[in-house]
Swiss-Prot record:
N-terminal signal peptide: none
Main subcellular location: cytoplasm
InterPro entries: Mur-like_cat_sf, Mur_ligase_C, Mur_ligase_C_dom_sf, Mur_ligase_cen, MurD
HAMAP family: MurD
Record localization: Cytoplasm
GO CC terms in record: cytoplasm
Name of the protein this chain belongs to: UDP-N-acetylmuramoylalanine--D-glutamate ligase
Catalytic activity as recorded in UniProt: UDP-N-acetyl-alpha-D-muramoyl-L-alanine + D-glutamate + ATP = UDP-N-acetyl-alpha-D-muramoyl-L-alanyl-D-glutamate + ADP + phosphate + H(+)
Enzyme Commission code(s) on record: 6.3.2.9
């Protein structure tokens, strides 16, 4: 960790705990800042706050008192899930207190170069592939960011010989200032998080911030399958490389069942361990980033032929009395669920879906639901999804949550059927994270399998 002095003796407010807030508070405390943490969860239920208090950090829990901001803070580090129209954030901005997210802090203290991955879908798989390939090549890659490992915590422990492979959400990127990755990658751009950003334009602008401090010495990797991404190529100062399944590009592409990096043959498409066009795109994106790091082809092929996938992303759990069960809790938007559905036979498929209501409808999903054997709906969007199912004459059942959904639908199914949790919605109406939602689904599966 760079022992930077800019935070020493500075009064800093960390708003919102969870993993990233706790990591930021501990790092800032180590750097000599005067840290105050404010979290809405009551102290007696707040393990993170209790641990921070033991470290001598001031904690204020149970509410968000506006007058706290009268204490002349030099900086606010905001949990990325807290919106910018939150009264505490609005008050900070009115007082000209800079508001950042924890990934900006990670950049400031990191001795290691950063590969940053963002986009609507495929981030987690692509991030994991890149890290696995670099490590297979004998390099030292550290997963961090939105993938479950707080960026500042990983950056604190990393050395200059490491590489931080960082998954970045639009929420995190809204709170950067000087953040500059060595390599940035945008997997794709589709409609998402409109409840948070207010518009698709604002959402895409947040994603685009990943490259705002880059120069021609840095590399930006874009998905040339998508016109929207292709059109960004001349809007950055970074050196652009691409990936495509449709044409030869300066980067990685597939042609006639073969994968190339520029004119160099890498492997056969059929050798990829993960099926589907979207996973081919993820693999190509990972190849470009890996080749920029000087990775040998042997390491790329080793990982891409054996990669088993990511937890909560079309994760095969096993069978219950002849019914196959998949956990795709990471599908937090319609497009991700569409991609999941494309790999199954609808006539034998039961879909479990629902979650946070972001204000969108599900008309886009209708063509993918045709001939579905049945659905179970839950969460804030249950009514919208039920109406969609009824419109298509799909048998539909209501449930309270993902665990009960699995238990309650089993009697309706038969051997040979497949049960897929692919919510098409964020988890925050009932769960802290999509990981928590998926873990509870896995637990329900294990209990029912006994």
């Amino acid at each position: 960790m760079k022992k930077i002095t800019k935070f020493k003796d500075q009064k800093i407010l960390v708003l919102g705990l969870a993993r990233s807030g706790m990591a930021a508070a501990l790092v800032l405390n180590e750097l000599g800042a005067i840290v105050t943490v404010n979290d809405g969860k009551p102290f007696e239920e707040n393990k993170e706050a209790q641990l921070l208090l033991e470290e001598g950090i001031k904690v204020i829990t149970g509410s968000h008192p506006i007058d706290l901001l009268d204490e002349d803070f030099a900086l606010m580090v905001k949990n990325p899930g807290i919106r910018y129209d939150n009264p505490m954030v609005e008050r900070a901005e009115a007082l000209n207190i800079p508001v950042i997210t924890e990934v900006e802090l990670a950049y400031l203290i990191s001795e290691a170069p950063i590969i940053g991955i963002t986009g609507t879908n495929g981030k987690t798989t692509t991030t994991t592939l890149i890290a696995d390939i670099l490590n297979a090549d004998g390099q030292s890659a550290k997963l961090s960011g939105n993938i479950g490992f707080p960026a500042s915590e990983v950056a604190e422990k990393a050395s200059a010989s490491d590489t931080l492979v960082m998954e970045l959400s639009s929420f995190q990127l809204m709170g950067i200032d000087s953040f500059r990755p060595k390599i940035a990658l945008i997997t794709n751009l589709f409609s998402a998080h409109l409840d948070y950003h207010g518009s698709q334009k604002a959402y895409e602008a947040a994603k685009w911030r990943i490259q705002e401090n880059m120069t021609s010495d840095d590399f930006l990797i874009l998905n040339f399958n998508q016109e929207k991404c292709r059109n960004l190529a001349d809007k950055t100062k970074a050196t652009v490389l691409a990936f495509s399944t449709k044409e030869k590009v300066n980067g990685a592409y597939s042609k006639d069942g073969k994968i190339y990096f520029n004119d160099e043959y890498i492997m056969e498409v059929s050798e990829l361990s993960l099926p589907g066009e979207h996973n081919l795109e993820n693999a190509l994106a990972a190849i470009v980033a890996s080749k920029l790091q000087g990775t040998k082809n042997e390491a790329i092929v080793e990982v891409l032929t054996s990669f088993a996938g990511v937890k909560h992303r079309l994760q095969y759990l096993g069978e219950i009395d002849g019914r196959k069960v998949y956990n795709d809790s990471k599908a937090t938007n319609i497009l991700a669920t569409q991609k999941a559905l494309s790999g199954f036979d609808n006539s034998k498929l039961w879909l479990l879906a629902g979650g946070l209501d972001r204000g969108n409808g599900f008309e886009e999903l209708e063509k993918d639901l045709q001939d579905l054997k049945g659905m179970v709906v839950f969460g804030q969007t249950a009514n919208k999804l039920r109406l969609t199912a009824e419109k298509l004459n799909i048998p539909v059942f209501d449930s309270e949550n993902v665990a009960k959904a699995l238990e309650e639908i089993l009697p309706q199914t038969q051997a040979g059927d497949t049960i897929l949790l692919s919510p098409a919605c964020a988890s925050w109406d009932q769960y802290k994270t999509f990981e928590e939602r998926g873990d509870l689904f896995i637990q329900a599966f294990e209990n029912l399998k006994k």
